[in-house]
Amino acid sequence: MSRTALRICPLCEATCGLVLTIDDGRVTGARGDREDVFSKGFICPKGAAFGALDSDPDRLRGPLVRVDGELREATWEEAWDAGAAGIRPVVERYGPHAVGVVLGNPNVHTMAGALYPPVLIAGIGTHSLFTASTVDQMPKHVSSGLLFGDANLIPVPDLDRTDHLLLIGANPLESNGSLCTAPDFPGRLKALRARGGTLTVIDPRRTRTARLADRHLAIRPGTDALLLAAMAHTLFDEGLADLGERAPHIQGLDELAAALDDFTPEAVASACDIDAETIRTLARELAAAPTAAVYGRIGSCTVPHGTLASWLVDVLNVLTGNLDRPGGALFPQAATDRTPRPAGPGRGFALGRWHSRVRRHPEAKGELPLSALAEEIDTPTDEGEPVRALVAVAANPVLSAPDGNRLDKALGSLDFMVSVDPYLNETSRHADVVLPPPPPAQSPHHDFAFNTLAVRNQVRYTRPAVPLEPGRMAETEILARLVLAATGMHGADPAAVDTLVIDQTLAKAVRDPHSPVHGRDPQQLAAQLTGDSGPERRLDMMLRLGPYGDGFGADRDGLTLDRLLAHPHGIDLGPLRPRLPQPLKTRSGKVELLPEPIAADLPRLRAALDERPGGLVLVGRRHLRSNNSWMHNVPALTGGSNRCTLHVHPDDAERLGVRDGQPVRVKGAGGEVTAPAEVTDAVRPGVVSLPHGWGHDRPGTRMGHAAVDPGANVNQLLDGSLLDPLSGNAVLNGVPVELAPSAAAAAERSAL
């Protein structure tokens, strides 16, 4: 019997609404939901392949427990017993920081990943937290924290109303957008062009996005912050800086101008390989546009000056009067955000509240660099204990972190490891307990994180499209039970975790004079919550307490879970609106243009004015049909353009004697890999490009299709000690490499 069901796609940040076709409990098709209030029918190849991913035969169907050195199928009870027996003794003997927690990118794509890891981390009490953020967007969190007082307060470009959009290090035609949730990003960019707007792309590669642009500038990798600083300098130098209506809420303008005095267009031109007059033109056009927005992403984050580049993106939006302005860059307001507080001074944002044990990296946003995980496991010091047990949730750092070989060995030395993962992959193969969540069609979905980054305010929720298969456990229950096992409450009802969070949240809300439930009885409020499960009751609570909520009866027209369920295609909450100064949490209550940590890092950027790479440098590459290391086991999403090839410019290929399709050895500070060359002028001379997330050739995994064409692990080329010092983010782009023909190719050539 065939039927359809709605499901929000969890496979990238666009969060498109899908209509799934289901036959006999199995997803057999997916199409875009034309009635979805946000995505309006858009679908990409990943969403279209939802059914293939959902039914991948290599997905684990039940838990695995290591017995006598081998992972064997086990019951859930055996798995929880083993988990509690492995984690608690480490905490009790060595302390909470000896237990590390690693969170992968898929956590932000699930309800469970949003709701339970914070409880797990707090329950253990560990400072040893490592996530995918420090190989991705942590610089943006840090710059936002320093500018606005809240690391999660990230302005997004108002794509649908802007007249001028400048993208740096971003390729949304392949990524579908990142830190900017926008279904049909390609269509929105085409609409910008159609209404007479201007699109500028700054990227060392001529990406699909660059090919759509009015102007593409192939910047030298790693010099993004220099270019942006020179643009800001031009605005000051030519009297073009105009803060507009937000001027009363901004401080530090004169200090910023002085700090950027050395970064003239002439001073940075050679380093960036963009001439001074072009830099001035970029700044002038930005200032002259009726509305404009600058947007930077992973290419400008994963470089030595990632935090400075992220900061300067928002500095340019401020200096042109486009921050918090329709058509500029605005702050979304999600339905599950906390109740808005009156504007005023906040607590500010702090870095370095604790440090890593080995190299003393400062924490950022509660996290330590993922690049430091291996050394935190394998290197003893006189201070503190090494990480002896590891909880990995949807994480594959052996592929996603620099120097995966070292981490691979380090994981084998742990006293205990538990992995929540649907696959036995390059990382989870080391676990003593593997806890597989069900396929996504069997899970509910609400986007807690991505709604705070969406280009339009809206709220959507979908319940599981198909019921849990026999023997499977909901991911929410898996993580709730993991909380209990790790905190000494093994055997308790997992619903107790949700009840505890609800009770604590409501108790705090009724004490808050700005809350809609101030002074009320928290137990009576809890009794009003609806939902079929603990996670749904928590969602209902967050909606009711949020900026659009009913306030538990205070606003009869406000949001509740019941109202959301009555609108299966979502509820549109309107375009983004100016919000300053209300969301600011800086100590001044204003946008602080030149925070002290930023000012202290500027001398390092000045030194970069004289730096020039002597040879080839490496950059990464996005694929539309992939997302990090996730999807290489789905035949429908591999092959074609989604291949692990090394892009080499024809001039470099000729100089080095590299032929198209030839296996090439790539050598970096961290090691070497071999990949087939793809000779193309899509990269600028002196730059080679290799995508990330590949390298599925390690023994002991169960990902059959991925192993057929495993690709090369680009992170093995990288120096794990090379980080952006403010954020701890890994430097993945602009790193020096050398090329040489593979042994087989060299032998073939010598035989000719």
Predicted regions and their residues:
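Catalytic, metal-anchored helix/loop core of enzyme active sites in primary metabolism
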Residues: 432
